[in-house]
């Protein structure tokens, strides 16, 4: 990873030399020498990074280079911030100005000395590395990182998420057992060591068509070592209930929550998966909501067989076995050679020989095989496969697996997969160390943090319209393809990963590497009490700190935050306090001493006032102020607009991807926004909100909508009455959301001509007509949402030829005036969901007439 850090530092030094020569007056030569030395050392780092696991001496040299790069950035940043601060104070008196000049001269001399000292350190490391035999790389061959990532995205589809080898017979047996259960609660346990495929098997059962038909409701909850009863119960209830119940469920007291969930499970036939439950005590604190007399069933995954037998001694216990050599190669082949049909048979045979040598080192563990398969999928030649094989033999034998245990073996394989990551993707991987076990990470936030810290390198040569956010997404996709992170949710329209999480074994590797690289300090409240954890931060030189509270800590105020001296943590670059309850509702004043801070989040905290010292944070890139109540913003935040925004201000935001804008009903605003289309060529999501006043006429958005030709998502909150013609919409439009539009005419006359529409959401007041006919040309429609109050006058619905639509809308149950639903040309499975006893029958049971036309029998 040092290679990526040095590259960023070299780039920043180059920008300073080019853009700030006056600031560097007197020390420019020293800065240039430092840049040259870093460039030279960067040529050694590829070989050094690969040899770190073999030699502690090499590890120390790499760490020294990394720290020297950080130190150089910190020194120059601090100097420029101090100089800029003096400049802004505008000293007028001659003596004070003279003192300022003398101070700057002293500072320059001091900075120059520190830069020379860093350069000297690096020169000594370079000499030592040469003597040790570290090889110098004169440049990377082949594609650039961004190009290779993009090429792999096209040639390596998301096959990893669906592979199932060695579990086929177990799957069918467990599914049949599950759907043949009686009227008493039964627990099906999948038990085995980490990396054996327990969660993979549970997911296959959870989504099996027989299971989906048998049960009415479904819930999947990650439990993990830190089992918090309220959170688990809430997650189960939220999964099982309708979205309009969410706020009420979240407001329930613990006792009410347990009672209501118990009644719900007794009334309904539900399937609940408790993934990764660790101990008997966790089962004891959760089990009270599960009624004995019920058609519901529970699947739990655990590493502890005692937990499985304790939960239900008479239940179904399944213990997946290690893969055989043949099964191991089958899984590796599926992942590593997927999409390579054009490879010569002789090369495939050679790769198979190497692959079979490689899987022997995996000991039959599916996780290790899957991760290595993802690694080999990035290698296209026999020589590259052979090199991986040699490194595996070396790494596994020397990597600490002397006891031969499977856990140590898989840990070695996962560590090797990290070493093979491209340098900048390594930093993205290590950022997962910030998050607790089994945490579902929002990718947008993760990517924005990596961008803000300079971890995502700008792309010089790439296709038009590609942004730095796209490159960040590519980094994340690379981790997905290598099975180093697991996808939570994908965007239906764009297929981008929206949320993801990390397997706990992979997370252990992530934490280990993050510690080795001094990347982040993780404070875990299970290791020391809360106050000591926070106070310990005051003596640390970390640039990133993750405070992870456990054991109900979320219900208490963080009383020790005021004891932390941020003044001693000046190197900190990210401070994320999301969800914390801070005593007094105010951050300490010495937050302003964190002069290198790039990211500060007080999201969903009780902070009511920002300290005035926040104005000192000149390098701030991301400031998240989405708090629970009102927030006082001090006037130290210069040029921080808190009033209305002029649409013309958007003309400078040429890379904007999503825009939500509130307009008056005046045509001038529409003309201005329409003109933005000439500049906002990368806009993918647009939300337009116009006040719906009774006396005002409907809005004509034809010109505005047709101006943006690349939109993938469009949301309209306005009085419309009639949709624009199909020619007005972007051909890429995949999602359309309508609020308060008052549509009278059937919108499907237009919507059926939009070829890529996948999501249609109709909210309150969006349609006031009496008939909807969805009859043709909507083959790609996958999701259709109808909210309560959306179509109160609707009498008839026709659904035909929407072959990808998974079911009728959830909100169909709100359409009290609905008299007829006609469904045509659909599968038997779709039909079975809607007939009496079917999974979705509750949606249409109030409709007098449900007609199935030309459906499978």
Swiss-Prot record:
Record domain NB-ARC: where: 148-461
Residues reported to bind ATP: 192-199
Gene3D superfamilies, A to Z: 1.20.5.4130, Helical domain of apoptotic protease-activating factors, P-loop containing nucleotide triphosphate hydrolases, Ribonuclease Inhibitor, Winged helix-like DNA-binding domain superfamily/Winged helix DNA-binding domain
Sample GO molecular function, one term: ATP binding
GO CC field: plasmodesma
Domain characteristics, as noted in the entry: The LRR repeats probably act as specificity determinant of pathogen recognition.
Family designation: Belongs to the disease resistance NB-LRR family.
Biological role: Potential disease resistance protein.
Record's protein name: Putative disease resistance protein At1g50180
Phylogenetic placement of the source organism: Eukaryota, Viridiplantae, Streptophyta, Embryophyta, Tracheophyta
């Amino acid at each position: 990873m040092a290679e990526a850090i040095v590259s960023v530092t070299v780039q920043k030094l180059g920008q300073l030399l080019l853009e700030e020569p006056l600031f560097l007056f007197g020390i420019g030569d020293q800065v240039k020498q430092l840049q040259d030395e870093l460039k030279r050392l960067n040529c050694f780092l590829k070989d050094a990074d690969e040899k770190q696991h073999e030699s502690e001496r090499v590890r120390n040299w790499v760490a020294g280079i990394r720290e020297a790069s950080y130190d150089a950035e910190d020194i120059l940043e601090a100097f420029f911030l101090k100089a800029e601060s003096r400049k802004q104070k505008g000293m007028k008196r001659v003596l004070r100005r003279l003192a300022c000049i003398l101070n700057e001269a002293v500072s320059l001399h001091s900075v120059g000395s520190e830069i020379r000292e860093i350069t000297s350190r690096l020169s000594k490391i370079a000499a030592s590395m040469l003597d040790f035999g570290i090889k110098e790389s004169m440049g990377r061959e082949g594609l650039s990182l961004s190009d290779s990532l993009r090429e792999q995205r096209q040639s390596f589809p998301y096959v990893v998420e669906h592979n199932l080898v060695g579990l086929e017979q177990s799957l069918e047996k467990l599914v049949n057992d599950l759907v043949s259960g009686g009227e008493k609660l039964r627990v099906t346990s999948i038990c085995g060591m980490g990396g054996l495929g327990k969660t993979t098997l549970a997911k296959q059962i959870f989504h099996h068509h027989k299971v989906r038909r048998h049960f009415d409701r479904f819930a999947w909850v990650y439990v993990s070592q830190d089992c918090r009863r309220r959170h688990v119960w809430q997650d189960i209830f939220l999964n099982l209930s309708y979205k309009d119940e969410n706020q009420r469920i979240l407001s329930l007291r613990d006792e009410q929550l347990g009672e209501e969930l118990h009644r719900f499970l007794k009334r309904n036939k539900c399937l609940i998966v408790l993934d990764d439950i660790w101990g008997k005590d966790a089962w004891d604190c959760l089990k009270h909501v599960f009624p004995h007399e019920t058609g519901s069933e529970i699947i739990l995954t655990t590493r502890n067989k005692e937990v499985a037998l304790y939960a239900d001694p008479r239940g179904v216990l399944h213990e997946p076995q290690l893969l055989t050599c043949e099964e191991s190669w089958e899984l590796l082949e599926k992942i590593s050679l997927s999409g390579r049909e054009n490879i010569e048979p002789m090369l495939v045979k050679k790769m198979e020989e190497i692959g079979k040598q490689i899987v022997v080192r995996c000991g039959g563990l599916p996780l290790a095989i899957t991760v290595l398969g993802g690694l080999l999928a990035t290698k296209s030649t026999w020589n590259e496969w052979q090199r991986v094989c040699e490194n595996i033999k070396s790494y596994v034998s020397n990597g600490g697996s002397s006891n031969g245990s499977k856990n140590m073996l898989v840990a070695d394989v996962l560590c090797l997969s990290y070493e093979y990551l491209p340098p900048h993707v390594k930093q993205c991987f290590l950022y997962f160390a910030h998050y607790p076990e089994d945490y579902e990470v929002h990718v947008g936030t993760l990517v924005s943090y990596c961008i803000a810290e300079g971890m995502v390198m700008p792309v010089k040569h790439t296709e038009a319209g590609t942004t730095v956010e796209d490159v960040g997404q590519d980094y994340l996709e690379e981790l997905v393809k290598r099975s180093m992170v697991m996808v939570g949710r994908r965007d239906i329209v764009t297929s981008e990963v929206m949320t993801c999480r990390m397997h706990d074994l992979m997370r252990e590797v992530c934490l280990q590497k993050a510690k080795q690289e001094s990347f982040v300090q993780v404070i875990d409240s299970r290791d020391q009490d809360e106050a000591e954890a926070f106070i310990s931060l005051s003596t640390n030189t970390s640039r990133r700190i993750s405070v992870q509270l456990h054991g109900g800590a979320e219900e208490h105020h963080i009383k020790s935050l005021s004891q932390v001296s941020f003044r001693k943590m000046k190197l900190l670059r990210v401070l994320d306090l999301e969800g914390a309850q801070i005593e007094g509702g105010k951050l300490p004043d010495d937050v302003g001493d964190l002069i290198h801070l790039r990211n500060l989040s007080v999201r969903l905290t009780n902070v009511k006032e920002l300290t005035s010292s926040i104005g000192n944070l000149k390098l701030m890139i991301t400031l998240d102020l989405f708090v629970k109540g009102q927030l006082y913003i001090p006037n130290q935040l210069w040029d921080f607009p808190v009033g209305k925004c002029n649409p013309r201000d958007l003309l400078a935001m040429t890379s904007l991807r999503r825009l939500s804008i509130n307009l008056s009903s005046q045509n001038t605003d529409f003309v201005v926004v329409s003109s933005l289309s000439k500049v906002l060529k990368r806009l993918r999501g647009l939300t337009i909100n116009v006040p719906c006043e009774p006396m005002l006429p409907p809005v004509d958005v034809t010109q505005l909508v047709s101006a943006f030709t690349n939109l993938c998502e469009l949301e309209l909150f306005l009085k419309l009455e009639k949709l624009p013609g199909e020619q007005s919409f972007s051909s890429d439009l995949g999602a359309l959301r309508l609020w308060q539009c008052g549509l009278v005419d059937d919108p499907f006359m237009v919507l059926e001509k939009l070829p890529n529409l996948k999501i249609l959401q109709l909210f309150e007041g969006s349609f006031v007509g009496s008939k909807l006919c969805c009859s043709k040309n909507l083959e790609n429609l996958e999701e259709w949402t109808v909210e309560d109050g959306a179509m109160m006058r609707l009498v008839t619905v026709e659904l035909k030829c929407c072959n990808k639509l998974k079911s009728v809308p959830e909100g169909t149950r709100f359409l009290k005036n609905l008299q007829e639903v006609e469904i045509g040309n659909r599968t038997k499975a779709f039909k079975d969901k809607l007939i009496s006893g079917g999974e979705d029958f509750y949606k249409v049971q109030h409709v007098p007439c449900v007609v199935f036309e030309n459906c499978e029998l």
